[in-house]
Amino acid sequence: MRVVRTAQMELGEIDVSQIKFDLRSRDDIPKVLRGLQHLYMNEELRQSVFALLESEIAPKVSKRNGRSGMTLWSILVCGVLRLDLNADYDRLHELVNQHKTLREMLGHSLYDEDKSYAYQTLVDNVGLLTPELLDKLNQIIVEGGHALVKEGEGVLRGRCDSFVVETDVHF
């Protein structure tokens, strides 16, 4: 039984749209997480992504019976992070259990320090994102990005400062 994301937030849990990132950080993890935050906040895009995930991840397994397992949101976040960082499962295991902002993105509160992901759980669940499924997700997300760019269509203006430097170069 998989859910997209648990409907009831826990005490101390921060909504994905309210997570603050260090905008001056030059690391790639906050950039990836900001992209996922935009995906989560765009209702239409989020619905189409999760409709695809629900239909493609273990389609023969009953969605109503069994234990809950990882949420589809957690699988998506871990899979995107693993691919964008070109990380192996050992690094992903360390990140999802220790990185504070990533744990907020996965839906853990400040009081969930004792909750951690097992290595094999990550391997089994992130492995459900096949290359074919990732290609379909990529198409949906790129179309959403193109719609975002089309909203801001207008006159493009550019500025640059330039000057001519006289040089005496001999080859």
Label each region the model flagged.
Residues 92-108:
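DNA-recognition alpha helix
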Residues 66-74, 114, 155-156:
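Secondary-structure capping and boundary motifs in well-ordered enzyme cores
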Residues 76-86:
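Alpha-helical support elements that line or immediately flank enzyme active sites
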Residues 1-51, 55:
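Charged, often Cys/His-bearing segments associated with DNA-binding zinc-finger transcription factors
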Residues 50-67:
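Short, Lys/Arg-enriched N-terminal segment that forms or immediately precedes the first helix
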Residues 84-94:
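Alpha-helix boundary/capping segments in eukaryotic regulatory proteins
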Residues 109, 113-171:
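Active-site- or DNA-interface-adjacent structural scaffold in DNA-acting proteins
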